[in-house]
Swiss-Prot record:
Function: Catalyzes the interconversion between ADP-D-glycero-beta-D-manno-heptose and ADP-L-glycero-beta-D-manno-heptose via an epimerization at carbon 6 of the heptose.
Record GO biological process: ADP-L-glycero-beta-D-manno-heptose biosynthetic process; lipopolysaccharide core region biosynthetic process
Gene Ontology molecular function: ADP-glyceromanno-heptose 6-epimerase activity; NADP binding
Organism for this UniProt entry: Salmonella typhimurium (strain LT2 / SGSC1412 / ATCC 700720)
Protein name, UniProt field: ADP-L-glycero-D-manno-heptose-6-epimerase
Chain's gene name: hldD
Cofactor: NADP(+)
Entry keywords, A to Z: Carbohydrate metabolism, Isomerase, NADP
Pfam families: Epimerase
Residue sites binding NADP(+) per the record: 10-11, 31-32, 38, 53, 75-79, 92, 144, 170, 178
Amino acid sequence: MIIVTGGAGFIGSNIVKALNDKGITDILVVDNLKDGTKFVNLVDLNIADYMDKEDFLIQIMSGEELGDIEAIFHEGACSSTTEWDGKYMMDNNYQYSKELLHYCLEREIPFLYASSAATYGGRTSDFIESREYEKPLNVYGYSKFLFDEYVRQILPEANSQIVGFRYFNVYGPREGHKGSMASVAFHLNTQLNNGESPKLFEGSENFKRDFVYVGDVAAVNLWFLESGKSGIFNLGTGRAESFQAVADATLAYHKKGSIEYIPFPDKLKGRYQAFTQADLTNLRNAGYDKPFKTVAEGVTEYMAWLNRDA
């Protein structure tokens, strides 16, 4: 059995889909479906069982055996970069992850988890998986950074696989439940379909991020499970592209619309990453050599998925 925490969420459900595509259906999804809309991410997927996150955590903390576990993909977390409740964030992202890590270590179960490029904070170069480059800007980034630091202490002694992925700007199918935290491509598509002008912040041609397609993210997760490699790795494309490029690809797909530029909000000044670009040296050195979709390729595929019933 493979366990996917956050399996009804964005990246988790895409990992479930990638496992299904390989013929794997003996999957336990762990999630919190208080937001009932997330169920839509699972309706076309095949899983063996579902468990609520709180019930799962109780079983983990009590040391209860959950059966023959082949691996745990730990994608369950609070991923809101605008959430400032530090206790909630540390409980959800740090303590929960530690409990799960030790459960896996004691049983030598491969543990593959979601870290984040938010660990790098506001830097504009050298996104390298090393302490001197890490300075998160928000409590979300700090919770991810602290767990990475915890993992670094354990890795040299670990007898089983531990691998963390620093996700950059992930976009693609099954993110509709994320609301304001969904990708720019998702929001632009929604605005166009509602007959509105798609909106970008002024200066969006200068705001560049490493936008990585979720299908590529899932593929990297599965490759690492098969390879058995451990470590903390950036997971982006290695190419920074502008928000304008995302908009251009969206408009090209729809063949209509023009961008409306809106003022940059004061509340985001100083807390907004203007540039991100994954350094893929460690990922490539680990042996992952497949190409990543460009924004034009990924957004076009995503638009086709979003508008498949149109």
